[in-house]
Structures are given as C-alpha cells and as structure tokens.
C-alpha cells in the first residue's frame, strides 16, 4: 500500500533511484495505491546524466509492494520492497529496461510493455 509521502525504489534505467509519492491517481479522495496503480511522484535521488533529474515530477506505476495483496484464487503476493516504473503520459515506460520481478496485476491493467520488458512476472 502506497500513500502520499511513501518512498519507492525505481525499477528501470531512467536514471532515478528513488521517488516520493505526492498523489495517488484515480479519484479525489483515493488514499492507497497497490500493484498496477498510477501515482504522481517526485524524483528524490538520481544518477548524473540520466533521463530524469532530482526534483522532476513524474508519473509512475507501482510494480512491487511490501504489503501483501490477496488474489482472486486465494493466494497472496508480497515483495521485499516498494518499487515503481516511471511512465510517459501514454502509459509506456520511459526507460528501456525493467529490473526485478513485477506483479501479474500489471497484465490485467494493460501495462503490456512493462510486462514484456520485465525479467519475471509473479
């Protein structure tokens, strides 16, 4: 569960290393974001020479959460960390590589480009 002020690792090669959630998209009073939800975030830590700089405001999709999520078949999925992938306005990733596994929920929410770039879908 991601909410305002949550810090997430960035799981792509855009140059950002850490982002801070400033808004969960999808309703005026929506509080939490899970796997596959889009957030607005600011870049808190970035490497020099990357596509994004520290202080940039970006859109990102959550790909891993430490809070367990119940699936329709009764199983639960959780990860060791909270992570996101920075996206463009058309929901395509800004980077060309994705690091680490991503949740299967991304396929249901039509983030097919991220699913195809990911090394593993859990």
Curated annotation (Swiss-Prot):
UniProt xrefs under Pfam families: Ribosomal_L14
Record-annotated disulphide pairs: none
GO CC field: cytosolic large ribosomal subunit
InterPro entries in the cross-refs: Ribosomal_uL14, Ribosomal_uL14_bac-type, Ribosomal_uL14_CS, Ribosomal_uL14_sf
Keyword S-adenosyl-L-methionine: no
Keywords: Ribonucleoprotein, Ribosomal protein, RNA-binding, rRNA-binding
The organism's place on the tree of life at top rank: Bacteria
GO molecular function, one term: structural constituent of ribosome
NAD as UniProt keyword: no
Subunit annotation: Part of the 50S ribosomal subunit. Forms a cluster with proteins L3 and L19. In the 70S ribosome, L14 and L19 interact and together make contacts with the 16S rRNA in bridges B5 and B8.
Chain's role: Binds to 23S rRNA. Forms part of two intersubunit bridges in the 70S ribosome.
Family: Belongs to the universal ribosomal protein uL14 family.
Protein name, per record: Large ribosomal subunit protein uL14
Organism annotation: Mycolicibacterium vanbaalenii (strain DSM 7251 / JCM 13017 / BCRC 16820 / KCTC 9966 / NRRL B-24157 / PYR-1) (Mycobacterium vanbaalenii)
